[in-house]
C-alpha cells in the first residue's frame, strides 16, 4: 500500500535527523523493540541510515515500524520527532473524519421522507447512542474485549440512518471522544463485489486515490471501529477454518478469510465492530454473535410511533385518529414498526383526510395502503386524471418489480430501467413520487422505496398480462453479486388482497384498467385447496395461507378456501400471528386436527405484579385461541409443540381443556415447557371426560408429573386409554413410576415409551408390572429403547402369561437372534394372546427365520408381523414363505422392507400371494428385487386368487415391459393400494416436531408457493425458478 510521499512517512527523513551517535543508540533500541514486538530479527549494527530505511518497510508492517519508532524516539527524548508523528496522526484522524463525512452524505436529504427521518431518528435514538457510547468505552461495565455490537432491525427500520447519525456525532466530537480514532465502513454490497483483498486495501477503498495512512490507522487497533452493514446479506458463508486465518494486513486473501480474520481479531487485535443485520439471524450472524456481545433491536415502539405520527401530521387530532386505526389491527401495527412503511402509511392517511374520505373504511389493510400510495403517486401530478401514460408507467414499474424479485435483484441499473421502457423523464417522475429512489448501498443504481412496494407491484404483475422479461442485472454473470430473495409470501399476500374487489377497485378506478387474471386465479385457488389433501406437496403449515386470507377478508371466498381443511398447523410468534389465525380458524367448520406452536410470546415473560398492556393483549388473543378447543364442534385432536408457557398462559390453556364442552379425543404435547411443571395442565386433564389419547413427548417427566398422571388414570371418569411418553429421557430409575401407572387399574390400554434409554434393567421392572393382575395393557410400544437380549427372557414370560397384551413393538432394539428367539418362542403356546409383533431393525439374521416360520404356521392369533430392516436375505425368505403358505397361517400383514431380498426369493413370494387367503398387506420396499422379481410378483397380483389389498414394491428403474405389467395390475385391480412409506414412518415411530426455537432451526417452508407457481399464468416463468436463468413474469 503506497503511503503519502510527504516527509510524514519518510523513514529516511526521520533517521537523518539523528546524529551518528544517536543513530547507533537507535539501532540498539530497535533490536530490543523487535524482540518486544516478537518480530523476525535481522542484523542492524552495520547498516547505514539509507539501508535501514529501505529494509524496514519490506521486513515489517507499517504499524509496527511507526509504533517502534515512536517508542524509541520517546526513550531517546527526541521530542521534535515525536511531535511530528503525533501531529501526523492527528491530521490523519481528521482526514479519516473527512473521508467518512463524504461517504455519509445523507442521500435521503434530497427526499421528503429522508429529511423527516433524519430529524426523527436524531431525536428518538438517544437510547441507542447511549449503548453505542458505553459499548466502546473500555472502562465501562458494558464493554468487553473484542466486542461486537449488533444493531438488529427489519429492512428499512432505520439501521443505516442510526449508523450514519452515530458516525456524524463522532465526526462532530459528540461521541467516542478519545475512544475511537478511525472508522472503516463496509457494506455487504461492497464485500459481495470483492474476491480477494488485503486489509490495507479494504481500509483504503474510501480514501482519495486509495491512499490511506494504514500505519497510523492500525497503530492502535483499540481505537479502530469497523462498521459492517447488512451482515445477513453477505453472499458467502463465513465458516473459515482457523488454520486459514491471516494476520498480515498487507497479504491478499479471499474475502471470507479476510472478514473472519478480522471478526476473530486475528487481524487488528482489539478493534471494535458495529454490525447491522436483520433479526432473521442467518448463519453468518449466529457464527459471530458471542455471549459478551451487545445486541440492540431497532423498531418503532408504541411511544416512538406516537412521536412519529405527531411529527408527521403536525395535528394531534389527526395523528390520534390515524394511530387509532393502526392500533386496531396487528398487521398495521407490524407495518408501522418500520420507519419507511410508517411514512407510507402516514402519507396515504393524510391524503385521504385531505380529500375528506373515510380513511377508516378505505385503508384497512396493507393492500389498501399500497394501492392508494401507488395510485396517488402516479396519477395526482398537477391534478391530472389517469391516462395511458400513467397506466404504461404502472405496467413498466410492475414488470421491473417482478423481473427483479424472480431474479433476486433489488437494486436496478440504468440499463435495467431502459430495458423495461423507462425514459429519464419517467425515472424523474417515479423519483419525485418517492417510488423509485437512488440506492444508498449501490452506486448509480435505483431501488423501490421499500421492498414491500416492489412486492406489491409484483403482485399486480401476477394479475396483469405483462410479458416475460429478463432484466440485465438478473443475468448469470451477476448471480454471485446480487441480493438473495426467496420468500414470496408477502407477494402472495398482496395477490390475495387484490382478489378483493373493493381493494382492487382502488387501482382499477385510478388507472381505468381491470386486472385480467383475477377471476381465473380466484377459481384456480379454490380448486387447488379442495384437492390439497390428495397433493403430495400439500401445505406443511398454514400461516402464510392465513395471512393471505386475512388480507383478502371476503367472507364467502375465505369460507370456500378453508372449507376443505380438516387439519391445520400454525406457528404463532406474535400477536399478529394469533389475530390472523383466529380470523381464519373461525371459518374452518370441518377442522378435526389443530397443530399449534407458540414461540417467544410468553417465553421468560412472567409478569412480576400484573401484566403490562402488551402482555394483556397477548393473553387476550391466547384466551381466544384456547376457546376454540371447546367451541369448535368438529375439533378432536390438538397437537401443541415447541411451546414456552408462563403461569398465566398455562392456566388459560388448562381452563380450556377442562371446559365441559371440550370434545378433544387426542392431546399431544411435544417440546413444551410450563411454569408449573405441568401441574396445572395435568390437573385440568383429570377433569376432562372426553380425552382418550394423551402424548407428552420430548419433555422431562418429573416425579410430581408421574404422581399426577397416576391420579388422572386412577380417576373413575378418566377415559385416557393411550399414554405416550416418547423421548422424555426416561431411564431404569423412572421405571418404578411407570410400573405404578401400569398397575393403577385404570383405563390405560396402550403405552408408548419409544426413544427412551430404558435399557434391559428398566425393562425387567416393567415386565413385573405387566404381569400384575391389575395391569390391563393391550399395546406396548418400545421403539429404540436401548433394549438387548438380556431382557428378552422377561419379555417372553410376559408374552406367555399376560392375559391382555395383544400388541408389542420392539423395533430398533439390539435383540439379535437370541433375543428374538426368546420373544417369539412364547407365541407357540395357546396362553400367548399376542396379535401384533413388530421386530424391525432388531439385528437378527436368516438363522432365526426357521423359528419365525414355525410361529407363522402354528399361531392362529397372530395377525401382524413387522420384521423389516433385518438381514433376512433370500434364504430366510424361503423359510418364511413356507410358513406363509401353511393353511393355519392367519397373518393379515407382514412387513419385509430393507431385508436384503433379491429376485431369487420372488418365485416363492409369488406363490404365497396366490395361496394365502388371509394376507392383505405386504411391504417389500427397499429391496433389490430387479425387473424379473417384480414381474413375478405383479403376475401373481393379477391372479383372482390373490387377496392382497395393500402392497409395497420397489418400482424405480423398471424396464418398459415391467412397467406395462404394472399398469395392467392397476387397471385390473384399481382398489389395490401401492405403498410408498416404510415401517419407520408409521404412526408411533415419530419422535415429535423439531422445535423451531432451538438454535439452528427455523419454521419450515409452508409450500404455499406451489399453489402460485403451478398456476398456468406462472408456469413458464417459474419452470426455471431455481436456476441462474430464472425468468420473470
UniProtKB/Swiss-Prot annotation:
Coiled coil: none annotated. SMART domains: LRR_RI, PYRIN. Residues 147-470 form the NACHT domain. Pfam families: LRR_6, NACHT, NLRC4_HD2, NOD2_WH, PYRIN. Transmembrane segments: none annotated. InterPro entries: Cu2_ascorb_mOase_CS-1, DAPIN, DEATH-like_dom_sf, Leu-rich_rpt, LRR_dom_sf, NACHT_NTPase, NLRP_HD2, NLRP_innate_immun_reg. Gene3D superfamilies: Death Domain, Fas, P-loop containing nucleotide triphosphate hydrolases, Ribonuclease Inhibitor. LRR repeats lie at residues 588-611, 632-655, 745-768, 802-827, 859-882, 919-944. ATP binds at residues 153-160. GO terms for cellular component: cytoplasm. GO terms for biological process: regulation of inflammatory response. Keywords: ATP-binding, Leucine-rich repeat, Nucleotide-binding, Repeat. Involved in inflammation. Belongs to the NLRP family. This is NACHT, LRR and PYD domains-containing protein 11.
